[in-house]
Amino acid sequence: MKRISLTLAIALAGCAPMAGGDDGHGKNVPAARADGAARNCVSVIALHDSEVRDYWTIDFHDHGKQWYRVTLPQRCNGLGNYRAFKYETSLSELCNTDIITVMEFGGPGGGPRGSCGMGMFQPVEIGK
């Protein structure tokens, strides 16, 4: 019984946040003010580019002046380092239920680095 308890305690310790550790929230993420109701999906045709801000945050910009901030429901490991991702959809929309795959480009061993669930698309005004 002691062996099982020790094994379980070690396994659970790996899931606990580290004291003083980096939680993946970037210190330089620009402030954003909500500008309307959050949306489940946005048209991929309307999206012009995206900016990965940290392990939790992606800002999408459409062809006009609209920005959408997606705060991922969980930290997406690798996203803050590689700052690149891909997605596949059979629809013409990217939705909060879709999965993104973190990508590493360049150098040997590049390629997919893990996948993460999306969040809601919050229309925002990005601060300077």
Spans of features found by a protein language model:
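C-terminal motif of bacterial Sec signal peptides marking the signal peptidase cleavage site
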Residues: 11-14
